[in-house]
Design a protein with these regions (language model features):
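Interfacial segments at transmembrane-helix termini and the short loops linking adjacent helices
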Residues: 80-102, 297-327
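Alpha-helical transmembrane segments of polytopic membrane transporters and translocases
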Residues: 2, 14-30, 61, 205-206, ...
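Helix-terminus/linker motif at the lipid-water interface of multi-pass membrane proteins
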Residues: 1-12, 83-87, 148-152, 215-246, ...
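Hydrophobic alpha-helical transmembrane segments
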Residues: 131-182, 203, 244, 353-358, ...
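Helix-loop junctions and terminal segments of transmembrane helices
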Residues: 2, 31-47, 122, 184, ...
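Membrane-interface junctions at transmembrane-helix termini in multi-pass inner-membrane proteins
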Residues: 108-135, 145, 179, 323-354
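Interhelical loop/hinge segments that connect adjacent transmembrane helices in multipass membrane
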Residues: 154-161, 173-218, 261, 268-276
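Interfacial/gating helices of multi-pass transporter permease domains
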Residues: 3-25, 157-161, 195-203, 224-245, ...
């Protein structure tokens, strides 16, 4: 991130962050289906007479259709919003449009790859998942260094997203080849199955509420910061997101390995083991974040100075508050997985998901009232604590 920030500059980094974030907002749809795909494949694997092949072929069909629908939405509403509503310097608008198209293509590729990624996680092939994750990071680092230090004269905000597209294609092809080779169900062709579609659609509709809340809390807040303060504050938000992702990644990887076990133990009827996983997983993931969050919160300014040199205004406050938000949110992650495993998520999503959606309107009211940008994180902490009580 330091190289990217120095390479692009604060203004272009803010553009890259806010335009990419706008595209990511549409992940609300794919996230709902991704959760359904992971749940149903894992559940079928946990059953003695399960049929993961039918789930996978149906999921692949749905994601291909979804990719086409999302592409249409981006090229109509998305382009209009980018050019008419977002606060971007006029002289960088053509480049912002290119970043938008590159982000759209990367997003479409990721949608199509969701069933294959879900299959790897459901089969608990964490060695492959970790290897491809490391490969993605290494490729990104190589591309960043190339763009930053290449002895050519080009617009870095055009070349960098182009290389990210290439990286995304390579990673998704790797998942495709691995799944086709090792998992029999992944050799099925896309197929519409009315029975599985009905179950997955019903699950996804209710899960849509939680995904909407997550997108509004993340990229929705990023959009609000752009509308009220411009791209410089978006750059600070991007820095905070990067730090938070690095810290939360430890707990996230732990949860990725734990979640299939919770779902499979429920499918097999082993409730005692499931509850022990929920309890230990919640405590361990909280401590994983806490170990890194405390020193970072205490020495945020020094860490950012060493890491980035000159960092955007509000970065220190944003990092500290975003880490606090993560500590509150991580407590309930295993409970969410357990509730998802049952397939009965309507009441949960209406209560907790509905509460989480309040992040966006409450943040808008706070900013409209003249509060500082940091107020959006205070709102997130208060809403998160309220959800724990539910």
């Amino acid at each position: 991130s330091r190289v990217i920030l120095n390479m692009l500059g604060v203004e272009d980094y803010g553009i890259y962050n806010v335009v990419g974030g706008f595209v990511s907002m549409f992940a609300i749809i794919s996230s709902a289906l991704s959760s359904a795909t992971s749940r149903f494949i894992t559940f079928e694997l946990g059953k003695k007479d399960g049929n993961p092949g039918r789930v996978f072929s149906n999921a692949l069909f749905i994601h291909l259709v979804l990719a086409a629908i999302v592409l249409f939405a981006f090229e109509t509403f998305g382009l209009w919003f980018l050019n008419e509503k977002m606060v971007i310097p006029e002289h960088r608008m053509p480049v912002a449009n290119y970043v938008f198209q590159a982000s759209v293509l990367s997003f479409i590729i990721s949608i199509i790859g969701v069933p294959f990624t879900s299959a790897v996680i459901a089969h608990e092939r964490m060695d492959t998942f970790a290897f491809l994750g490391v490969l993605e990071v290494v490729m990104k680092l190589v591309f960043v260094l190339f763009v930053a230090y290449a002895p050519f004269n080009f617009d870095k905000l055009i070349v960098f997203p182009s290389l990210m597209i290439g990286m995304g294609i390579c990673i998704q092809l790797s998942y495709w080849f691995f799944c086709r080779k090792h998992f029999e169900e992944c050799r099925c062709r896309p197929k519409f199955d009315r029975g599985y579609f009905r179950d997955m659609f019903s699950f996804s509709v209710w899960n849509f509420i939680g995904c909407t809340a997550g997108i509004l809390k993340g990229q929705g807040i990023n959009m609000l910061l752009n509308l009220f303060f411009g791209t410089v504050v978006n750059a600070a938000y991007g820095v905070a997101c990067t730090v938070n992702s690095a810290v939360s990644g430890f707990a996230g990887n732990f949860m990725t390995a734990l979640n299939p076990q919770i779902t499979k133990s429920y499918a097999s009827g082993d409730r005692e083991y499931m509850f022990s996983l929920i309890d230990r997983g919640s405590r361990f993931s909280f401590y994983l974040i806490l170990i890194f969050a405390i020193p970072l919160m205490l020495e945020t300014d020094h860490v950012l100075a060493i890491w980035l040199g000159d960092y955007p205004e509000y970065s220190v406050a944003f990092v500290r508050l975003m880490l606090a938000v993560s500590l509150v949110d991580i407590i309930s992650n295993t409970l969410i997985t357990a509730q998802t495993a049952t397939g009965k998520i309507r009441n949960y999503q209406l209560a907790v998901g509905g509460m989480l959606m309040m992040n966006f309107p409450f943040s808008y009211i706070a900013l409209k009232s003249g509060c500082s940008p940091s107020a959006v994180f205070v709102v997130a902490i208060m809403v998160g604590l309220a959800c724990l009580l539910l």
